[in-house]
Amino acid sequence: MEGLLSVALQGAELEGNWKHEGQVEDLQENQESCPEPEAVACKGDPAGDSMQERDEFSRIPRTISSPAATQASVPDDSSSRRCSAPGESPKERHPDSRQRERGGGPKKPWKCGDCGKAFSYCSAFILHQRIHTGEKPFACPECGKAFSQSVHLTLHQRTHTGEKPYACHECGKAFSQGSYLASHWRTHTGEKPHRCADCGKAFTRVTHLTQHRRVHTGERPYACAQCAKAFRNRSSLIEHQRIHTGEKPYECSACAKAFRFSSALIRHQRIHTEEKPYRCGQCAKAFAQIAHLTQHRRVHTGEKPYTCQDCGALFSQSASLAEHRRIHTGEKPYACGQCAKAFTQVSHLTQHQRTHTGERPYPCHDCGKRFSNRSHLLQHRLVHTGERPYRCLQCGAAFSHVSSLIEHQKIHTGERPYKCGECGKAFSQGSSLALHQRTHTGERPYTCPECGKAFSNRSYLIQHHIVHTGEKPYECSGCGKAFSFSSALIRHQRTHADSSGRLCPAPTPDSTPGLSQGGETCQQGCPGRNPRGPAED
């Protein structure tokens, strides 16, 4: 296994190095283009060590070697393909080899006039100069993309052909480049040779380390040309640019919904598969996304890492903090397209839009009543269960809704935090203030569909509507007479009151007609009772 990794790494090194078989063509093209002022005589690709490396590369098994590499015809006259350094005779064109034998480093006689970088071979120097000139002489015939080196074109063309000549012996996965295979192989060995000097985190690929280092340095070299937002890596920039272009290249095969990011598609597909791969170790609750599991764990730990700089409020989620911050800024970025009403949260906008569409997607399974909001359904369910989980600590009164408890507690505190700006009248509830303010504005938003009469309060409309339906839901327990309004029932019940002002109870089979509970005669002439006084003997 180690032998395979070394071979793969050899192939990766050769593939990433300028001494690659594909670059032989580049160097042969460059052999007559060395700078004249330096009297450089480029006679082809450097041999020596590079020939030995190419021989080793050609011996890599076909499962991890490039067919082009094994079939390439490489001339053997390596001695005639050395580049002579300035002022060198052909017999003296290996100064670096003698220095290496003595333990010294190779000479680098070709120096870039733009950046000062030096090279041992003029061909490498010429390839480097294309960085400054921007020259890209190798163009892809399929898409027209151009490259500065033919080896880069060869690698690129595999994106069109789908060729993946480097296969993993362990799992069979294939790759278009040897360096990708070498990196992949580390998933089997667990090797992470590239370690961050700042935090000690290790990575399988040097590119991953380079990207990670930007977390410490704050470097964001990839900037969006449209909005100037900067990113640490190029892939993040490409994904971001889809926001501007509207491109959604990842489509769900089940429902055809499209996404900008492949990760978003993967998360979405779990809706269809119902896969929940992320499980909480404490309560075994499972989640489709790891971010949701991370947030859920804070329920157990009580961790609230996000702090509001204005008021010090703590939050377990960054999104909750962002929404809270709008209380201080007054920002309402989500506007309704029909009435222009704005909201601080997109969920509030979604709920509001249902007032226009009439959509009520949450049905009660007990009575069939439907609701536009899930929280309203949960509150309604308490009607069926009779549960009153919210109890007042001062008087013991219990409530089915926490909002009802909060309003009730103001009875004990006397708090009236909602004050009318017109007349200064204060209220304990915001809804009471809203109703009161309509007395100043004259607003009557509730209209009867039968007769068009408008009301400032929804409850007034409900009471009024009984006039049209003829419904009489309020019945007198004393005489059975029914009324449309509770106020009418209260007025009627006063006709049954005894001399002390107490209401007469409903007659029972065992009670004496015409007598109140205290034995006094009913003075108001209830049906079936004696209005004239006690019964005669």
From Swiss-Prot:
Function of the molecule = May be involved in transcriptional regulation.
Give the signal peptide, or none: none
Where in or outside the cell? Nucleus
Question: Which organism is this entry from?
Answer: Homo sapiens (Human)
Q: What InterPro entries has UniProt attached to this entry?
A: Znf_C2H2_sf, Znf_C2H2_type
- Keyword flag Signal: no
Could you identify this protein by its name?
Zinc finger protein 835
Q: Does the keyword Metal-binding apply?
A: yes
